[in-house]
Amino acid sequence: MGQGLLQIGLTLCIVIAITPVLGRYIARVFLGERTILDRVMNPIERSVYVISGVRPKDEMTGWQYIRAILYTNLFMGILVYSLIYFQRLLPWNPNGLGVPSWDIVLHTVISFVTNTDQQHYAGETTLSYFSQVAALGFLMFTSAATGLAVGIAFIRGLTGRKLGNFYVDLTRGITRILLPISVIGAIALVLLGVPQTIGETLTITTLEGGTQYIARGPVASFEMIKMLGENGGGFFAANSAHPFENPNGLTNLIETIAMIAIPAAMIYTYGVFAKNIKQAWLLFWMVFIVFVILVWVAAGGELQGNPLVNGTLGIEQPNLEGKEVRFGWAETALWAVMTTATMCGAVNGMHDSLMPQGLFATLFNLFLQIIWGGQGTGTAYLFIYLILTVFLTGLMVGRTPEIFGRKIEKREIVLASLILLIHPIVVLIPSAIALAYPFSLSGISNPSFHGISQVVYEYASASANNGSGLEGLTDNSLWWNLSTSLSILTGRYVPIIAMLLLADSMSRKQTVPQTPGTLKTDSLIFTTVTAGIVLILGVLTFFPVLALGPIAEGFKLASGS
């Protein structure tokens, strides 16, 4: 127990230490200030702009920024679909893999272009090295940079700046942040035992005389951007539970830190943009405290173990089902909460084997989307709740709602409400349909309370652009591929459109002078109220589902049945 808690504590301390450093660096990149990589990256970026015809000094309006995102993502999606469809004709296919079915290719492309990386296939038996690295690896960089650009544009709008240029933000996000850190991280992973090869699957003879096939590939480079970009899609079916993706405790620590580094730093980045570091730290600690509570809930459940198993065997041991022994209950519980909090979706153990407490914590993260949140967009979601808090507290005390010196009016509240309503709509309605018809129910491996969790988790993960799943669900079917694709697209692009329109609206407003009656948003009281509103809205929206799923399952286990 002590060792497990020490591992969790060490990881959290590292997160706190790197947040201001990386947050300040990200701010310098997108504020156009000098950075250590200027000498190397400036010529590369200028070449990219010249070749693509981008004028980096041109500012975009909200709709121009939105159209740039949609057109770019559509083009990249069509390109990658074509690459996967013709993978049998392309190089780096030593195992001679053919073409997957059209629906799995469509789901995969939609999933990766939106930074969701939900996988209904096994990478080592479905996709060639070229499809994994050149096609999906390309999307891992661009989808992460797209989310990062949205988050930065949203922060610019809230702080009274123009939104910027999407193509410039996309390029700088890759060249100055994602690519350099990924290169360093990939080298570290190679040194720690993660393979990086284009050799074919090995065929070996075991000690018993049998034949075993060992899949391998260019894993290290794929793995690092998978974690850093909050992508989460694994090179192998077992994801980061596979010893070739995550062989030991040190690689596990590196990947865990990479997973949370940018979402945590983005809160500090806002503080630099707004010139209000105090508020950034208040918001950071608000998110951090809720995160630690959820880790405590999940870790406590795993440490307690399964009461039915322990009672039958007459022992007291943690729940080790679905876990890698090299990580144990503590690192698996921390990872499970972190991967759903950051919308990464990678796993180092099977979430379907989590105790009800752990399942509650992971679902709660998927429902809220702000306990760190996704790449860039999570920060935007956090400030949506901040805007609603200002509006509600202003109504209660009779003050005109203002935030960052700008009035909050009907348009902003309508857009904020739309952003928060889309997620439950594209989670709960498809879940109800899936639970109502036999053709979708056939994929559920557990007909009880856990079966409800399997279905809701699948759609919550899709809509939140997380990508993890309770793998007791047989999800590689036409229904699940198409229905989750719809949830992914709606949950990704509708909020992004609304966020950018809201930011554009705020950027055009005149600054209102502060008065003694102005509500201060950088106070402990206001931050506490914000946390309360976040939790209340999350509980009110999804509590019936939580009650029918992990809460009911927990009571059933506690009763000994």
Curated annotation (Swiss-Prot):
InterPro entries: KdpA. This is Potassium-transporting ATPase potassium-binding subunit. GO terms for cellular component: plasma membrane. Its main location: membrane. The system is composed of three essential subunits: KdpA, KdpB and KdpC. Belongs to the KdpA family. GO terms for molecular function: P-type potassium transmembrane transporter activity; potassium ion binding. The chain crosses the membrane at residues 2-22, 66-86, 135-155, 177-197, 253-273, 280-300, 327-347, 354-374, 378-398, 413-433, 482-502, 531-551. It is a multi-pass membrane protein. It comes from Nostoc sp. (strain PCC 7120 / SAG 25.82 / UTEX 2576). Signal peptide: none annotated. It is found in: Cell inner membrane.
